[in-house]
């Protein structure tokens, strides 16, 4: 469903993506691991078309997104959604308004249909009946679930997750992992998750890829990644201070 070919992206003199290649099959969950700041979020922004590569191509369903007309690009984006690292909820809107925001803002459905979808989406993330609460009344884990409900409310075919378990305790993180896996199975969506949390990666991934120095250096099933001989991957997944990865080599 998604293919990245030879992506290069620099910000000033910092080369973030350096001939990055990656392919994601329809209906699978791919987890991209790597150190903080290695370019994982930049990769996601290329997939949804927020960032344009300096060179290279981004394909979604066989279409080069940067060769599409604006109207076609807008249609394509409506088939995707993203769960942001911090949730990105609007503090001035209640939960129901946050979850249904995109549907109403873009005039996709009637208000009655929007309320129906909001109720369904909140039920799928185990938050039934919280529509009237404000974001300030929610725990960190609840905010993450509301953000996920907002993402699935538009019925996307492709879901992108940016560090979905960052900032929550291990028990809440595990419940979010279970929810991601459950939603994938129920909705049959294609999912791309970026994280440096290996417990999450092993739990939710069909396949795992590691981004290092701007390119994918390893890809495989969770079992293959766990048993890799690649010294860089082994150092990262085992959380070891000593090894080929240093602050200078990863920058």
Predicted regions and their residues:
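Catalytic Walker B motif of ABC-type/P-loop ATPase nucleotide-binding domains
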Residues: 159-162
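A short, proline-enriched helix->beta-strand linker immediately N-terminal to the Walker B motif
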Residues: 153-157
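Short coil-to-helix segment of the ABC ATPase nucleotide-binding domain corresponding to the Q-loop/switch region
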Residues: 92-101
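Helix-to-loop junction immediately C-terminal to a conserved catalytic motif
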Residues: 48
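Conserved ABC ATPase signature
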Residues: 134-138, 142
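Conserved ABC ATPase "signature" region
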Residues: 63-64, 111-129
């Amino acid at each position: 469903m998604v293919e990245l070919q030879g992506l290069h992206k620099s910000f000033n003199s910092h080369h973030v993506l350096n001939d990055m290649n990656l392919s994601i099959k329809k209906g699978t969950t791919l987890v991209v691991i790597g150190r903080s700041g290695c370019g994982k979020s930049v990769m996601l922004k290329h997939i949804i078309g927020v960032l344009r590569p300096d060179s290279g191509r981004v394909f979604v369903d066989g279409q080069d997104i940067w060769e599409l007309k604006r109207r076609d690009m807008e249609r394509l984006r409506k088939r995707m959604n993203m769960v942001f690292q911090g949730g990105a909820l609007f503090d001035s809107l209640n939960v129901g308004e946050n979850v249904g925001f995109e549907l109403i803002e873009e005039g996709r459905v009637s208000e009655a249909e929007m309320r129906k979808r909001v109720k369904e989406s909140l039920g799928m993330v185990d938050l039934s009946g919280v529509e009237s609460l404000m974001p300030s009344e929610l725990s960190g884990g609840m905010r993450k679930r509301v953000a996920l409900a907002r993402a699935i409310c538009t019925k996307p075919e492709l879901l992108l997750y940016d560090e979905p378990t960052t900032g929550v305790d291990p028990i809440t993180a595990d419940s979010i992992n279970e929810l991601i896996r459950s939603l994938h199975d129920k909705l049959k969506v294609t999912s791309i998750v970026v994280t440096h949390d290996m417990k999450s990666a092993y739990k939710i991934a069909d396949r795992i890829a590691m981004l290092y120095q701007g390119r994918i250096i390893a890809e495989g099933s969770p079992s293959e990644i766990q048993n890799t001989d690649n010294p860089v991957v082994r150092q990262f997944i085992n959380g070891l201070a000593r090894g080929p990865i240093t602050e200078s080599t990863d920058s």
